[in-house]
Structure formats: structure tokens, C-alpha cells
Amino acid sequence: MLKTRIIPCLDVKDGRVVKGVQFLELRDAGDPVESAKAYDAAGADELCFLDITASHEARGTLLDVVSRTAEACFMPLTVGGGVRTVADVRTLLLAGADKVGINTAAVKNPDFVAEAAEKFGDQCIVVAIDAKRVSGPDEAARWEIFTHGGRNPTGIDAVEFARTVSERGAGELLVTSMDKDGTRSGYDIALTRAIADAVRVPVIASGGVGGLDDLVAGVRDGGASAVLAASIFHFGHHTVGEAKAHMAAAGLAMRLDP
């Protein structure tokens, strides 16, 4: 049985870790390399860096932070933000990323996903999906893709887009609920489950973790293969070890350090 992964996420802006609520109201949470080293020591299964300034301000990705983190840490590292070309993917992989997250560019051109997966292997291509519920209370649930850090609506159905990019070669999908992001009210389980049921690749649940039971629900109810969280770890509400123990006690297969 594949073990469930816990993935702390470091949102990086101007070289600092930040954490916002629904992609806004950013507050400083520390140095990314030091944070990464702490998560590595704590037993995190993977780490995710998202350069949240890159897409909408046309910033380059944080290669210096990535390379210093890769030198200091042994856990797999996913890096996203501002990835627009195959050359961007290559540069991040050479800097030390194990996987590269593609967001806005995949929405603009799903064939870019196929091109990157063919060149580097689908195992290192993660498509990041930022979605917001657009259906009314009496309608069937429907979510729309947003790009550029959640600023631009696209009119694209999130579940259909997930199906498209998984067929084009995405090895994994990072699904973030913009409605839940930073609220500490739990994942959007319906969104996570809808996408997990629609694709054959692993889904990472993201956006809204407030407690350890939310992590369990993301896997058990949402069908996620991995759970991503930020605030509960960054600000000391829980440790990665506590999260793993809680999930294991709930019957989920976890990688537990001796």
C-alpha cells in the first residue's frame, strides 16, 4: 500500500515565507531555507515551494533558495511559480527541484504539460489547480479555475481541466481550494473528491487545514494521496510528527520515522 504523504508548503514572496488568507493579507513566516531544514528534520515526506509573486509580477523563480534548500535537505522538493517554458522546468530541476509545479502556463496551453512530461518524465510534473466554487447552493457543485495567484477567473471547469492535464502527462495534481485557503476550516472535500475520482494520477489536497482531523478527512473522504498544509505547521499548532501519528492512528498508512 502506498503511504500517505504529508507536504508542508512554503509560500515564498520576495525571498521570505509568507502565509495569507484566501491568497491575500500576507504575513511573514520566516526564512525559507531555515524552514525547509526544520521540516526535513521533522520528517516531512516532501516539501513544496510556491513563489506566489512569480506569475503575476513576472518574477523569475527562486533559484538561489531552491539550490540552497536542495543542498541542505534530503526530502523531495516541489517548486512552482512563474514556470512558463520547458527551459524554466529544466532550470528548476538543475537547481535541485525534484518536481516542478505548473499553474498558469498549463491553463493557457495544456500542451505545455505534455511537452514537459515528454522531456523530463511525468513523475516530475505537477499541475497546480487553484479553484473556486462557482455553483449556487441549489446547483450541482461546480468549480472554476483561477490563475495568476488567484486573481484571474478563466471560465474553465476545474474537474474537466484536471482530466485534461492528467491525460496530457501531469504526474500529480495539487488541488487548492481558494475558498478554503488560509481559513483553517478544513479542505474542500467535495472538490478534492470530484477531481480524485476523475483522474488516475495522485491528488494532493490543499487549502484550509485547521487541525489534524482535516488531514485525515482529505485522504479518507477526499480521496487524496497526499495532504498539503502550511499554517498549522508554520505557526506551531502541530508538528509533522504529531500529524503522522494522528493519521496513522486513524488507520492511514504513513511513513513513520523510527
Swiss-Prot record:
Reactions catalysed according to its record:
5-[(5-phospho-1-deoxy-D-ribulos-1-ylimino)methylamino]-1-(5-phospho-beta-D-ribosyl)imidazole-4-carboxamide + L-glutamine = D-erythro-1-(imidazol-4-yl)glycerol 3-phosphate + 5-amino-1-(5-phospho-beta-D-ribosyl)imidazole-4-carboxamide + L-glutamate + H(+)
Gene3D superfamilies from the xrefs?
Answer: Aldolase class I
Q: What class of enzyme is it?
A: lyase
InterPro entries listed in its UniProt record: Aldolase_TIM, His_biosynth, HisF, IGPS_HisA/HisF, RibuloseP-bd_barrel
Does the keyword 4Fe-4S feature in the UniProt annotation? no
Q: Name one GO cellular component term.
A: cytoplasm
Task: Give the top-rank taxon of the lineage listed in the UniProt record for this protein.
Answer: Bacteria
Q: In which pathway does it act?
A: Amino-acid biosynthesis; L-histidine biosynthesis; L-histidine from 5-phospho-alpha-D-ribose 1-diphosphate: step 5/9
Q: Which GO terms describe its molecular function?
A: imidazoleglycerol-phosphate synthase activity; lyase activity
Q: Where in the cell is it found?
A: Cytoplasm
Which EC number(s) does UniProt give?
4.3.2.10
Which NCBIfam families does the record cross-reference, listed alphabetically?
A: hisF
* Its biological purpose: IGPS catalyzes the conversion of PRFAR and glutamine to IGP, AICAR and glutamate. The HisF subunit catalyzes the cyclization activity that produces IGP and AICAR from PRFAR using the ammonia provided by the HisH subunit.
**What is the protein named?**
Imidazole glycerol phosphate synthase subunit HisF
What organism does the record attribute this protein to?
Methylorubrum extorquens (strain PA1)
Which gene does this sequence derive from? hisF
